From Swiss-Prot:
Protein name: Arginine biosynthesis bifunctional protein ArgJ 1
Annotated residues for binding of substrate: 146, 168, 179, 259, 378, 383
Disulphide bridges: none
Catalysis: reaction(s): N(2)-acetyl-L-ornithine + L-glutamate = N-acetyl-L-glutamate + L-ornithine; L-glutamate + acetyl-CoA = N-acetyl-L-glutamate + CoA + H(+)
CDD domains hit by this protein: OAT
Originating species: Streptomyces clavuligerus
Job of this protein: Catalyzes two activities which are involved in the cyclic version of arginine biosynthesis: the synthesis of N-acetylglutamate from glutamate and acetyl-CoA as the acetyl donor, and of ornithine by transacetylation between N(2)-acetylornithine and glutamate.
Lineage: Bacteria, Bacillati, Actinomycetota, Actinomycetes, Kitasatosporales
GO MF annotation terms: glutamate N-acetyltransferase activity; L-glutamate N-acetyltransferase activity
Length: 383
């Protein structure tokens, strides 16, 4: 169940000493070929980390032989030296693997504004390269964790081919993408343009529909590598469906491990005039701190849902809005509906349905509650 499950993928992780916990903090995922096609999606934040800028350049060639990922330092807002360090990282991996640095993607996660400990990182690349294995995906997934409490992996099989993936992310989770690093692999034989469309389509309806705290990272990276080792050549829709399943699995694991969360909130907006309206309403509900506090207190406060909807530009009439919480329509036609005491909120997952009664479009956004643990964790996060 890891990123190295597809044929032609190897991986590994090691400890290089940038985490006070002493946990693994450097990961390597390698596409052994015969094909090395790749595509990716990056943060929409205008302040981009050095590894994002580097990897964007690498992907212009449509080929990636390996991805080096470090946790414990974002290498963001580090100026020319930060970019030089990323370049040196790619060069070291290229030398260890026998490839060109122009085919080595780099991803980083951790504290913004600090330089990476290159004296420890570069030897770590050599160590990770020496320990590469088709069974090394789990160790790679463990090595990219920051505030994550669990490592996150997923695999799905097609007809004679498969897709695997790993992800990290627990805080700064918001659309565009979400604060995350994701590496996806497949042994299907597909060209870069096909991979590019597939990964963008998958990200749009999975990672971009996760909104934990409304904060957008400088380092978000989703990479898709295709080895072609299975010889399988699926049609676009077949491949896209499997890829989407893997991304959805990983996205759900991200929200389930969000910092300090005690509730996972599934927000479904239905009967919207457009999909964009549905997404806007869902995101706005997801970011409403008063509602998130109410959910934490197991209070089915539908008024806060309507208040959030009212701040959007979506098409709707206030007197036609309906809201259900865990299946109980607590708001009907813009006013009180069924009794709030009918809503059972004891369980981890809370389902909110917002019916705009304005069209035929819908969208699902995943969020979580706001807790004292979240505040503590982020106030204690060292700067």
């Amino acid at each position: 169940m890891t990123v190295t499950a597809p044929k032609g993928s190897t991986g590994g992780g090691c400890r290089r000493g940038s985490k006070e916990s002493g946990q693994p903090d450097l990961a390597l995922v390698v596409n052994e070929g015969p094909r090395r096609a790749a595509a990716g999606v990056f943060t929409a934040n205008r302040v981009k980390a050095a590894p994002v800028l580097w990897s964007q350049q690498v992907l212009r060639g449509g080929e990636v032989s390996a991805v080096v990922l470090n946790s414990g330092g974002a290498n963001a807002c580090t100026g020319p030296k930060g970019f030089q360090d990323t370049h040196a990282t790619a060069e070291r991996a290229a030398a260890a693997l026998g490839h060109s640095a122009a085919e080595i993607a780099v991803a980083s996660t951790g504290l913004i504004g600090t330089y990476l400990p290159m004296d420890r990182l570069l030897p770590g690349i050599d160590k990770a390269a020496a320990e590469l294995s088709p069974h090394g995906g789990e160790r790679a997934a463990i090595a990219i964790r920051t505030t994550d409490t669990v490592h996150k992996t997923a695999v799905r099989a097609g007809e004679g081919w498969s897709v695997g993936g790993m992800a990290k992310g627990a805080g700064m989770l918001a659309p565009g993408l979400a604060t995350l690093l994701v590496v996806l692999t497949t042994d299907a034989d597909l060209a870069p343009p096909v991979l590019d469309k597939a990964v963008r389509d998958a990200v749009r309806t999975t990672f971009e529909r996760v909104d934990s705290d409304g904060c957008m990272s400088t380092n978000d990276t989703v990479l898709l590598l295709a080895s072609g080792a299975s010889g399988g050549d699926p049609g676009y829709e077949e491949f896209a469906d499997v890829l989407r399943e893997v991304c959805e699995d990983l996205a759900r694991k991200l929200i389930g491990d969000a910092e300090g969360a005690s509730k996972d909130i599934r927000i479904e907006v239905i009967h919207a005039a457009t999909e964009d309206d549905a997404v806007e309403v869902g995101r706005t509900i997801a970011r409403n701190n008063l509602l998130k506090c109410a959910i934490h207190g197991e209070d089915p406060n539908w008024g806060r849902v309507l208040s959030a909807i009212g701040t959007t530009k979506a098409v709707f009439e206030p007197e036609r809005l309906n809201v259900a919480i865990n299946g109980v329509w607590v708001c009907r036609e813009g006013s009180a509906g069924d009794g709030r005491d009918l809503v059972d909120m004891r369980f981890r997952e809370v389902r909110i349905t917002a019916d705009l009664d304005a069209g035929t479009h819908s969208a699902v956004i995943w969020a979580n509650d706001l807790t004292a643990e979240y505040v503590h964790e982020n106030s204690a996060y060292s700067s």
